A protein has these predicted regions:
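Short, basic/aromatic beta-hairpin or loop at an interaction surface
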Residues: 6-19
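Short alpha-helix capping/helix-loop boundary micro-motifs
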Residues: 22-26
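Short, acidic/hydrophobic/Gly-rich beta-strand patch recurrent on exposed beta strands
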Residues: 15-16, 31, 51-54
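Short, surface-exposed secondary-structure edge patches
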Residues: 4, 27-31
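C-terminal structural segments of small proteins and small subunits
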Residues: 10, 44-74
């Protein structure tokens, strides 16, 4: 399992679990649910934030938030 912050642009992955943290509920409300497929669409010029497609939506996450999401490759 890898962290979402380690995944390359365009590589589809599946959310597996979250690091226990206060951001857990915020991520769930945004559509980051275990079993959901995600793709990193873009990375800002300085590497932070990243743009992600999840549940048909395009969202931005900071790298420290993405590092709390564990994913697996199909």
């Amino acid at each position: 399992m890898k962290r979402l912050s380690e995944i390359a642009i365009g590589q589809p992955v599946t959310i597996e679990k979250f690091e226990e943290d206060e951001i857990f509920l915020k991520l769930m409300e945004m559509g980051f649910i275990p079993g959901e497929k995600v793709i990193i669409e873009q990375v800002a010029p300085l590497g932070d934030p990243i743009s992600i497609e999840v549940a048909g939506y395009r969202l931005s996450l900071r790298l420290n938030e993405a590092s709390k999401i564990f994913v697996s490759e199909p």
